[in-house]
Protein backbone atom coordinates (compact mmCIF):
# COMPACT_ATOMS: atom_id res chain seq x y z
CA UNK A 1 0.00 0.00 0.00
CA UNK A 2 0.91 3.65 -0.24
CA UNK A 3 1.93 5.05 3.13
CA UNK A 4 3.88 8.02 1.82
CA UNK A 5 1.84 10.37 4.00
CA UNK A 6 4.05 9.31 6.92
CA UNK A 7 7.42 11.00 7.23
CA UNK A 8 9.29 7.84 8.23
CA UNK A 9 8.15 5.97 5.12
CA UNK A 10 10.46 7.95 2.86
CA UNK A 11 13.40 6.67 4.92
CA UNK A 12 12.54 2.98 4.45
CA UNK A 13 13.89 1.51 1.19
CA UNK A 14 11.54 -0.30 -1.18
CA UNK A 15 11.92 -4.06 -1.51
CA UNK A 16 13.78 -3.67 -4.80
CA UNK A 17 16.43 -1.60 -3.03
CA UNK A 18 16.69 -3.99 -0.06
CA UNK A 19 16.75 -7.49 -1.60
CA UNK A 20 18.12 -9.15 1.54
CA UNK A 21 15.51 -7.70 3.90
CA UNK A 22 12.86 -10.18 5.01
CA UNK A 23 9.90 -7.85 5.56
CA UNK A 24 9.53 -4.12 4.88
CA UNK A 25 6.97 -3.44 7.63
CA UNK A 26 9.00 -5.17 10.37
CA UNK A 27 10.08 -2.65 12.97
CA UNK A 28 7.51 0.02 12.20
CA UNK A 29 4.31 -1.56 13.57
CA UNK A 30 4.53 0.40 16.80
CA UNK A 31 3.61 -1.62 19.92
CA UNK A 32 0.74 0.07 21.71
CA UNK A 33 -2.82 -0.64 22.82
CA UNK A 34 -5.21 0.04 19.94
CA UNK A 35 -8.94 -0.12 19.35
CA UNK A 36 -10.18 -1.17 15.91
CA UNK A 37 -13.51 -1.75 14.26
CA UNK A 38 -13.76 -5.48 13.57
CA UNK A 39 -14.74 -4.89 9.93
CA UNK A 40 -12.00 -2.34 9.24
CA UNK A 41 -9.52 -2.92 6.43
CA UNK A 42 -6.02 -4.32 6.82
CA UNK A 43 -4.72 -1.11 5.26
CA UNK A 44 -6.31 0.95 8.04
CA UNK A 45 -4.95 -1.38 10.70
CA UNK A 46 -1.43 -0.98 9.36
CA UNK A 47 -1.89 2.76 8.84
CA UNK A 48 -2.81 3.12 12.52
CA UNK A 49 0.40 1.35 13.58
CA UNK A 50 2.43 3.48 11.18
CA UNK A 51 0.83 6.73 12.33
CA UNK A 52 1.73 5.91 15.91
CA UNK A 53 5.30 5.07 14.92
CA UNK A 54 5.58 8.26 12.90
CA UNK A 55 4.52 10.31 15.91
CA UNK A 56 7.33 8.84 18.02
CA UNK A 57 10.21 9.88 15.76
CA UNK A 58 10.70 13.59 16.39
CA UNK A 59 12.57 16.17 14.34
CA UNK A 60 15.26 16.16 17.03
CA UNK A 61 15.69 12.41 16.60
CA UNK A 62 16.04 12.77 12.83
CA UNK A 63 18.62 15.49 13.43
CA UNK A 64 20.55 13.20 15.78
CA UNK A 65 20.45 10.42 13.20
CA UNK A 66 21.92 12.78 10.62
CA UNK A 67 24.58 13.87 13.09
CA UNK A 68 25.56 10.24 13.68
CA UNK A 69 25.43 9.41 9.95
CA UNK A 70 22.86 6.74 10.81
CA UNK A 71 19.74 5.82 8.86
CA UNK A 72 16.32 5.29 10.38
CA UNK A 73 16.28 1.58 9.39
CA UNK A 74 19.66 1.14 11.08
CA UNK A 75 18.32 2.73 14.25
CA UNK A 76 15.18 0.60 14.30
CA UNK A 77 17.16 -2.55 13.54
CA UNK A 78 19.48 -1.84 16.46
CA UNK A 79 16.52 -0.96 18.68
CA UNK A 80 14.81 -4.23 17.80
CA UNK A 81 17.76 -6.15 19.23
CA UNK A 82 17.72 -3.98 22.34
CA UNK A 83 13.99 -4.73 22.65
CA UNK A 84 14.58 -8.48 22.48
CA UNK A 85 17.73 -8.67 24.61
CA UNK A 86 17.05 -6.20 27.43
CA UNK A 87 14.55 -5.34 30.07
CA UNK A 88 13.81 -1.61 30.20
CA UNK A 89 16.30 -1.04 33.00
CA UNK A 90 19.06 -2.56 30.84
CA UNK A 91 18.15 -0.92 27.51
CA UNK A 92 20.99 1.61 27.56
CA UNK A 93 23.58 -0.92 28.69
CA UNK A 94 22.68 -3.49 26.04
CA UNK A 95 22.45 -0.77 23.39
CA UNK A 96 25.96 0.40 24.30
CA UNK A 97 27.37 -3.12 24.00
CA UNK A 98 25.90 -3.45 20.52
CA UNK A 99 27.12 0.00 19.52
CA UNK A 100 30.60 -0.89 20.76
CA UNK A 101 30.53 -3.93 18.49
CA UNK A 102 29.35 -1.79 15.57
CA UNK A 103 32.13 0.78 15.99
CA UNK A 104 34.62 1.06 13.13
CA UNK A 105 37.53 -0.14 15.28
CA UNK A 106 35.62 -2.93 17.01
CA UNK A 107 37.48 -6.24 17.49
CA UNK A 108 34.05 -7.94 17.50
CA UNK A 109 32.18 -6.60 14.43
CA UNK A 110 29.28 -9.07 14.67
CA UNK A 111 26.31 -8.72 17.03
CA UNK A 112 26.35 -12.46 17.84
CA UNK A 113 22.84 -12.33 19.25
CA UNK A 114 20.92 -15.57 19.68
CA UNK A 115 17.72 -13.66 18.96
CA UNK A 116 18.62 -13.92 15.26
CA UNK A 117 21.01 -16.75 14.51
CA UNK A 118 21.48 -20.19 13.04
CA UNK A 119 21.58 -21.74 16.54
CA UNK A 120 18.51 -23.97 16.70
CA UNK A 121 19.15 -25.02 20.30
CA UNK A 122 18.33 -21.46 21.37
CA UNK A 123 15.14 -21.06 19.35
CA UNK A 124 12.68 -19.83 22.00
CA UNK A 125 13.20 -16.26 20.84
CA UNK A 126 15.01 -16.55 17.53
CA UNK A 127 13.81 -14.53 14.57
CA UNK A 128 15.30 -16.78 11.90
CA UNK A 129 13.86 -19.97 13.36
CA UNK A 130 10.52 -18.67 14.66
CA UNK A 131 9.48 -16.30 11.87
CA UNK A 132 11.60 -16.58 8.75
CA UNK A 133 11.86 -20.38 8.61
CA UNK A 134 8.08 -21.01 8.94
CA UNK A 135 7.38 -18.40 6.26
CA UNK A 136 9.53 -20.31 3.78
CA UNK A 137 8.32 -23.73 4.92
CA UNK A 138 11.43 -24.73 6.85
CA UNK A 139 15.02 -23.72 7.44
CA UNK A 140 16.36 -25.47 4.36
CA UNK A 141 14.03 -23.42 2.16
CA UNK A 142 15.21 -20.01 3.36
CA UNK A 143 17.10 -18.25 0.56
CA UNK A 144 20.81 -18.18 1.31
CA UNK A 145 21.00 -14.40 1.05
CA UNK A 146 18.35 -14.03 3.77
CA UNK A 147 20.18 -16.37 6.16
CA UNK A 148 23.45 -14.57 5.48
CA UNK A 149 21.80 -11.19 6.09
CA UNK A 150 20.13 -12.12 9.41
CA UNK A 151 22.47 -14.62 11.05
CA UNK A 152 24.27 -12.34 13.49
CA UNK A 153 27.07 -14.86 13.96
CA UNK A 154 28.08 -14.55 10.32
CA UNK A 155 27.06 -11.10 9.08
CA UNK A 156 29.19 -8.14 10.09
CA UNK A 157 27.39 -5.09 11.43
CA UNK A 158 23.63 -4.89 11.56
CA UNK A 159 21.34 -7.40 9.84
CA UNK A 160 19.32 -6.38 6.79
CA UNK A 161 16.34 -5.24 8.86
CA UNK A 162 14.65 -5.20 12.27
CA UNK A 163 13.75 -8.47 13.99
CA UNK A 164 10.84 -7.05 16.00
CA UNK A 165 8.85 -3.86 16.53
CA UNK A 166 10.65 -1.92 19.28
CA UNK A 167 9.02 0.44 21.73
CA UNK A 168 10.11 4.01 22.28
CA UNK A 169 12.37 3.18 25.26
CA UNK A 170 14.44 0.79 23.14
CA UNK A 171 14.53 3.27 20.25
CA UNK A 172 15.77 6.09 22.46
CA UNK A 173 18.36 3.83 24.08
CA UNK A 174 19.63 2.72 20.68
CA UNK A 175 19.92 6.31 19.51
CA UNK A 176 21.58 7.76 22.61
CA UNK A 177 22.45 5.15 25.25
CA UNK A 178 23.38 6.19 28.77
CA UNK A 179 25.22 3.10 30.03
CA UNK A 180 26.62 2.46 33.46
CA UNK A 181 30.36 2.03 34.05
CA UNK A 182 30.18 -1.75 33.77
CA UNK A 183 28.66 -1.65 30.28
CA UNK A 184 30.33 1.48 28.91
CA UNK A 185 33.27 -0.29 27.25
CA UNK A 186 31.81 -3.81 27.14
CA UNK A 187 31.57 -6.07 24.10
CA UNK A 188 29.79 -8.96 25.81
CA UNK A 189 26.87 -9.58 28.11
CA UNK A 190 25.08 -12.61 29.50
CA UNK A 191 22.03 -12.98 31.72
CA UNK A 192 20.96 -15.47 34.35
CA UNK A 193 17.53 -16.86 35.19
CA UNK A 194 17.11 -14.29 37.97
CA UNK A 195 17.34 -11.49 35.43
CA UNK A 196 20.81 -10.23 36.32
CA UNK A 197 23.06 -8.94 33.53
CA UNK A 198 26.83 -9.46 33.46
CA UNK A 199 28.96 -7.24 31.20
CA UNK A 200 32.51 -7.85 30.02
CA UNK A 201 35.12 -6.23 27.82
CA UNK A 202 37.15 -9.34 27.02
CA UNK A 203 36.22 -12.88 26.05
CA UNK A 204 37.93 -14.30 29.12
CA UNK A 205 35.89 -12.00 31.37
CA UNK A 206 32.76 -13.01 29.49
CA UNK A 207 33.52 -16.72 29.91
CA UNK A 208 33.91 -16.15 33.65
CA UNK A 209 30.57 -14.33 33.70
CA UNK A 210 28.97 -17.23 31.84
CA UNK A 211 30.17 -19.55 34.60
CA UNK A 212 28.70 -17.23 37.25
CA UNK A 213 25.38 -17.14 35.40
CA UNK A 214 25.41 -20.92 35.02
CA UNK A 215 25.86 -21.33 38.78
CA UNK A 216 22.89 -19.05 39.44
CA UNK A 217 20.82 -20.94 36.89
CA UNK A 218 21.75 -24.26 38.50
CA UNK A 219 20.55 -22.96 41.86
CA UNK A 220 17.31 -21.67 40.37
CA UNK A 221 16.61 -24.96 38.61
CA UNK A 222 17.35 -26.89 41.80
CA UNK A 223 14.81 -24.78 43.70
CA UNK A 224 12.02 -25.56 41.24
Spans of features found by a protein language model:
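Bacterial extracytoplasmic/cell-wall-associated proteins, especially those involved in peptidoglycan
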Residues: 2-224
Amino acid sequence: GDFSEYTFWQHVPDDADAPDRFMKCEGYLFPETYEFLKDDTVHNYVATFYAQFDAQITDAMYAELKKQDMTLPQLITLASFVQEEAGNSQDSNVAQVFRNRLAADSPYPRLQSNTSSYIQSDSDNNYLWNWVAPYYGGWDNIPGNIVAAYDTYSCKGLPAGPISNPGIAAIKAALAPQPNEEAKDAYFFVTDLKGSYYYARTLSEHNANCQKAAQVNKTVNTEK
